[in-house]
UniProtKB/Swiss-Prot annotation:
Function per UniProt: GTP hydrolase that promotes the GTP-dependent binding of aminoacyl-tRNA to the A-site of ribosomes during protein biosynthesis.
Residue ranges, annotated region (G2): 69-73
Annotated residues for binding of Mg(2+): S20
Name this protein carries in UniProt: Elongation factor 1-alpha
Gene Ontology molecular-function annotations: GTP binding; GTPase activity; translation elongation factor activity
InterPro entries linked to this entry: EFTu-like_2, G_TR_CS, GTP-eEF1A_C, P-loop_NTPase, T_Tr_GTP-bd_dom, TRAFAC_GTPase_members, Transl_B-barrel_sf, Transl_elong_EF1A/Init_IF2_C
Record-linked HAMAP family: EF_Tu_A (MF_00118_A)
Signal peptide region: none
Biological classification of the source: Archaea, Thermoproteota, Thermoprotei, Sulfolobales, Sulfolobaceae
Compartment annotation: Cytoplasm
Source species: Metallosphaera sedula (strain ATCC 51363 / DSM 5348 / JCM 9185 / NBRC 15509 / TH2)
Length: 435
């Protein structure tokens, strides 16, 4: 394990905007892929006549390796810069990418947003159906304020390497991000050609007009978020493994507090208590885990079937809250008609995804002031924000955003799209007996 400070990075962006190629190039330039793997990927890409996609092939190779080897390794892409040790969360290109992005983004410290400069591709990413828009909204909801916008495929802009095209894209995205409340001093824009590595780790000879940082330099300008070590322990479960000779090994990231070997913990909403026998991260044993650590931990007295993804771990002295009902401030980002009482989207919060019924629309808010504009409206439409009460269909752990931000912000999904995003103001707890 590197002694450098550690950051979790997520790579987001519209399909075909060059996420995989960018990540592959970065890992290769930083020397975190061996020659043999690179050669094999190049040959595989050549065979299929997709030479320009050799870096994307590299990632797929890594993905297969991960699927074959059942390690407790949540993430498989790690690299170092001069200043930091990075883990890349969840390779892009998943069928359930947005769903995974929601759970992944809730664990990330910063994001790289890949945006293609190719004519038509940028425009489709920013269309109403586009994922560039959707991913920007989700990144903001999930509390990701540090974003590096990589404007990719500058070599196929028209004309190639065109500064005007770069500026046009930058201005459009800046305007959109500002409208969602991003602090633009924490957002960097970089024109990139991943396939040749221009402005990834080395400066581009073709874009002399750009004098900002390379991607690698921008990564070193990121800041480490403060660790909430003084708060109670909260660890949402990402996966649960059963490993022969070891036992049950849940995996997840510590969001707040500290977990130590020997601690008495409880899994909610299951209400199952256990003792922590060992903790490890990236195959290194730890005596204690702090916020930001992606860990696998072995527990005594728990069967694999007792716990699942979306459960939250806390100490028995301060168990995570299970909500009978919760109240949130919601923005409707997409809906063909309107949302009324009884509407039941799937709520994605930390690593959980549970259908929740709208039990009351308390008030519609004035978008300019955020103050109440109408009490108990019949419905809310796209672009509107409101205070809404939800009732989870199945037991669900959530917390007030002001107490535990990662467990207090969520996205609502329906019909394969993000319908809305929200922040929880209040939770009515349900009584769960600890076994």
């Amino acid at each position: 394990m590197s002694q450098k400070p550690h950051l979790n990075l997520i790579v987001i962006g519209h399909v075909d905007h060059g996420k995989s190629t960018l990540v592959g190039r970065l890992l290769m330039d930083r020397g975190f892929l061996d020659e043999k793997t690179i050669k094999e990927a190049e040959e595989a890409a050549k065979k299929l006549g997709k030479e320009s996609e050799k870096y994307a092939f590299l990632l797929d190779r890594l993905k297969e390796e991960r699927e074959r080897g059942v390690t407790i390794n949540l993430t498989f892409m790690r690299f170092e810069t001069k200043k930091y040790f990075f883990t890349i969360i969840d390779a892009p290109g998943h069928r359930d990418f947005v769903k995974n992005m929601i759970t992944g983004a809730s664990q990330a410290d910063a994001a790289i947003l890949a945006v293609s400069a190719r004519k038509g591709e940028f425009e489709s990413g920013m269309s109403l159906e586009g994922q560039t828009r959707e991913h920007i909204i989700l990144a903001k909801t999930m509390g990701l304020n540090q974003v590096i916008v990589a404007i990719t495929k500058m070599d196929v802009a028209e004309p190639p390497y065109d500064q005007k095209r770069y500026n046009e894209i930058k201005e459009t995205i800046e305007k959109f991000m500002k409208s969602f409340g991003f602090d633009m001093s924490k957002v960097k824009f970089i024109p990139i050609v991943s396939i040749t590595g221009e402005n990834v780790t080395k400066r581009s000879e073709n874009m002399k007009w750009y004098n900002g940082p390379t991607l690698e330099e921008a990564l070193d300008m990121l800041e480490i978020p403060p660790k909430p070590v003084d708060k109670p322990l909260r660890l949402p479960i990402q996966e649960v493994y059963s490993i022969s000779g070891v036992g049950t090994v849940p995996v997840g990231r510590v969001e707040s507090g500290v977990m130590k070997v020997g601690d008495k913990i409880v899994f909610m909403p299951a209400g199952k208590s256990a003792e922590v026998r060992s903790i490890e991260t990236h195959h290194t044993k730890l005596e204690k885990a702090e916020p930001g650590d992606n860990i696998g931990f072995n527990v005594r007295g728990i069967d694999k079937k007792d716990v699942k993804r979306g459960d939250v771990v806390g100490h028995t002295t301060n168990p995570p809250t299970v909500a009978e009902e919760f109240t949130a401030r919601v923005i409707v980002v997409w809906h063909p008609t309107a949302l009324a009482v009884g509407y039941t989207p799937v709520v994605h919060v930390h690593t959980a995804s549970i259908a929740c019924r709208v039990s009351e629309i308390v008030a519609r808010l004035d978008p300019k002031t955020g103050k109440e504009a109408e009490k108990n409206p019949q419905f809310i439409k796209q672009g509107e924000s409101a205070i809404v009460k939800f009732k989870p269909i199945k037991p669900l752990c959530v917390e007030k955003f002001s107490d535990f931000p990662p467990l207090g912000r969520f996205a609502m999904r329906d019909m394969g799209k993000t319908v809305g995003v929200g922040v929880i103001n209040d939770v009515k707890p349900s009584k769960i007996e600890i076994k």
